[in-house]
Amino acid sequence: MSAATLRRYQPRDEDVSVALWLRTWQKAYPELDFAARLDWWRERWRNELLPVAEVVIAETDGTIIGFVTVDPRTFYLDQIVVAPEFWRCGVGATLIAEAKRISPSGLDLDVNIDNVRAIGFYRRLGFLITGVGKNPTSGKPVHRMSWRP
């Protein structure tokens, strides 16, 4: 396996990216039925994220293993997804570094309060908890986390 490389999202990446989103979130929250949200997610991907966000793909040996979405106008990092078999391999940190390059004035994101693994990951990369809220889809409580240079 070679090191991950980054590239810009292409429309041909949609099916693989959506499938990776499903697989990754299902692994992180097996008690939730993300398959039931797939149509909603695909519509959100096409109509809410792609028109405003820069999407960067991480791949190795030609296989997509992660992606990050960043809206540089609002600093909002909506999604960072890494294939579970690549968790703790540096892919997420590489994607966050690219997100910081895209939005050098700062980044904001929301993370489920019970996602201790992700909160620790973001903290290690310089993010601080700056607020609390509620995920509008799941109703789960979230931390707003922010990074500023």
State what each model feature region is:
Residues M1-R12, W147:
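Conserved N-terminal entry element of GNAT/NAT acetyltransferase domains
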Residues A83-C89, I113-D114:
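Active-site acidic-Proline motif in GNAT/NAT acetyltransferases
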Residues A93-T94, D114-G131, T137-P141:
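Conserved active-site alpha-helix within GNAT-family acetyltransferase domains
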Residues R8-E85, I96-E98, I102:
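Acetyl-CoA-dependent GNAT
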Residues A53, G139-M145:
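Short hydrophobic/aromatic beta-strand or adjacent loop that forms the aromatic wall/cage
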Residues I102-D114:
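Conserved GNAT acetyl-CoA-binding A-motif
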